[in-house]
Curated annotation (Swiss-Prot):
Residue positions of the active site: 286 (proton acceptor), 351, 404 (nucleophile)
Membrane topology: Multi-pass membrane protein
NCBIfam families per record: lnt (TIGR00546)
Chief location of this protein within or outside the cell: membrane
Molecular-function annotations in GO: N-acyltransferase activity
UniProt xrefs under Pfam families: CN_hydrolase, LNT_N
One Gene Ontology cellular component: plasma membrane
Family matches, as CDD domains: ALP_N-acyl_transferase
UniProtKB keywords: Acyltransferase, Cell inner membrane, Cell membrane, Membrane, Transferase, Transmembrane, Transmembrane helix
Any one biological process term the GO annotation gives: lipoprotein biosynthetic process
Protein name, entry field: Apolipoprotein N-acyltransferase
Lineage: Bacteria, Pseudomonadati, Pseudomonadota, Alphaproteobacteria, Hyphomicrobiales
Length: 530
């Protein structure tokens, strides 16, 4: 082990970059669908040893001293995001004749840009670097800070945050209800990096003790919470989730729209599964209705005829506002609408956090001059909604809807979840087929249920549609590409272990604690040297 660490530390040039790239790619095995988190106990010690050797020129400027550490982090991040996000290119192959040219920009360009975050993480860590356990604390702080920044800078994209690798199963998910993702990211990197101390004499026992303590607390809290009796349900809701498995090549084909709509109606109207009552709520996926209701008011009549007394449908739609379909001043929203048993739209919630280049074109007027408008997928460019609110369901239950990747933002969900008893996530991951993408998306939605102590109802066009309880356990689900519907009675009893505000404070305190430890040990080492 010491010989291996020594050889890693002495690497430089392309060899150092290659090992950093491979270490980052290896860390992706800790994410869904692989969930092989043991790989992170190899990749992060490798990163620590690479940073040990990334000292720069001692007589140079601060920039020159830190540049090698930044480069190591960038290469680690490039490997991590390239191996973890390659599936994004699948969306461009759905209409390959039009979008295939952009494949390299998506598959390579996005990881290239995101890698700068991890370069910044290792740069920050190197500023606080010291020997032994101090550098582990510094690295944990650097990644924790960077993962937090990744959640909101440049519109935010906290996909595959390192902390998810420490939560592959419900037993290991419960801690996030207290630490939040901010704290979980810090603690995960710290734990994954501790094996780097196996080659050190000093702090080895302390590192081993901290590893046992933190790992035991992580597992123990999960065991206690899962074993604890659930709070008695105040009420329940009979839910049907529909997964139509519509082929994207037909999604907006006018000649098959009626057939798609008939499929949705048929799955919604079928008899309840044995042991289940009539659904009070039916849930359809994102943009599941293949036309505008302004163009097809008869569709609302058909929905009113299909829904029984007291039933409600929540459906993902493209919603038009401001004119007719031919109007140049019309605005379109990626929305969910609530429809009652009379075929009336009683509520609508528009997607607030749109996907850049996927649902709208940033700096559109400028980029249109360069012909980049065609990067925007789908039939229209969407406008962002102004606010999100809970939808009232039968029985006085309130559900908070999140459309597609909105659910990956912990703070976005936590801010609003206090006003609801259910989290609803509608999505269309069919763009990415049976690649790691839909599994990663589902895992992040699953964690939102645990964080907020609320059941999650998820409808996806081609999967994964599921009901998840407040402790992250999958009650029922439909696999990718399966067509069907699931009926579940959802007890309404969950509540967060701590409030969203307290969870955020806890995470920030954990991050600051590791920054303080790293800084103090760095100062102590400098004083000893001088």
């Amino acid at each position: 082990m010491e010989r291996l660490a020594g050889r890693i530390i002495l690497l430089w040039g392309w060899r150092r970059a290659l090992v950093a790239f491979l270490a980052g790619a290896l860390a992706v095995l800790g994410q869904a669908p692989y969930d092989f988190f043991a790989a992170c106990f190899i990749s992060f010690p490798l990163l620590v040893w690479l940073l040990d050797g990334a000292t720069g020129e001692a007589s140079g400027s601060l920039f020159r001293r830190l540049l090698p550490a930044f480069a190591v982090g960038w290469w680690f991040g490039f490997g991590y995001f390239l191996a973890g996000l390659w599936w994004i290119g699948s969306a461009l192959l759905v209409e390959a004749d039009e979008f295939a040219w952009a494949l390299p920009f998506a598959v390579v360009g996005i990881p290239f840009a995101l890698a700068f975050f991890y370069g910044f993480a290792t740069l920050v860590a190197r500023l606080l670097w010291s020997s032994d356990i101090g550098r582990i604390a510094a690295l944990a702080f650097g990644f924790g800070l960077t993962e937090w920044l990744r959640g909101f800078l440049f519109t935010g994209f906290p996909w595959n945050a390192i902390g998810y690798a420490a939560m592959p199963v419900p037993l290991l998910m419960q801690s996030v209800s207290v630490t939040g993702m901010i704290g979980m990211n810090v603690l995960a990197v710290f734990l994954f990096s501790l094996p780097a101390l196996l080659v050190a004499r000093r702090h080895l026992r302390l590192g081993a003790a901290l590893f046992v303590l933190l790992a035991s607390a992580h597992v123990g809290f999960g065991y206690i919470r899962l074993a604890a009796p659930e709070k008695p349900a105040e009420r329940s809701l009979d839910v049907r989730i529909v997964q139509p498995a519509v082929d994207l090549s037909e999604k907006w084909d006018a000649s098959v729209r009626d057939r798609i709509f008939a499929t949705l109606l048929g799955l919604s109207a079928k008899a309840p599964d044995p042991g289940h009552g009539k659904p009070q709520l039916i849930l359809w996926p994102e943009t599941s209705v293949p036309f505008l209701f302004t163009e097809r008011p008869d569709a609302l009549t058909a929905l009113g005829d299909m829904l029984a007394d007291g039933q409600m449908l929540i459906a993902g739609v493209v919603r038009e506002e401001g004119g007719s379909a031919a109007s140049t001043d019309s605005r379109y929203y990626n929305s969910v609408v609530a429809i009652n048993d009379r075929g009336e739209i009683t509520d609508a919630v528009d997607k607030v956090h749109l996907v850049p280049f996927g649902e709208y074109l940033p700096f559109g007027d400028l980029l249109n001059r360069f012909g980049i408008a065609q990067l925007v997928a789908g039939p229209v460019t969407f406008a962002a909604g102004n606010e999100r609110h809970a939808i009232s369901l039968p029985g006085g239950i309130r559900a908070l809807p999140f459309i597609c990747y909105e659910v990956i933002f912990p703070d976005l969900v936590a801010v609003d979840a206090t006003s609801a008893q259910l989290i609803v996530n509608v999505t269309n991951d069919a763009w990415f087929g049976d690649t790691p993408g839909p599994y990663q998306h589902f895992r992040q939605a699953q964690i939102r249920a645990v964080e907020n102590g609320l059941p999650l109802l998820r409808a996806a066009n081609n999967g994964i549609s599921a009901v998840v309880d407040p402790r992250g356990r999958i009650v029922d689900a439909l696999a990718i590409d399966a067509r069907g519907a699931i009926d579940v009675k959802v007890p309404i009893s969950g509540q967060a272990v701590v409030s969203s505000a307290q969870r955020r404070i806890n995470g920030m305190l954990i991050m600051l604690l590791f920054a303080l430890v790293g800084a103090l040990l760095n100062v102590r080492q400098r004083l000893r040297v001088n």
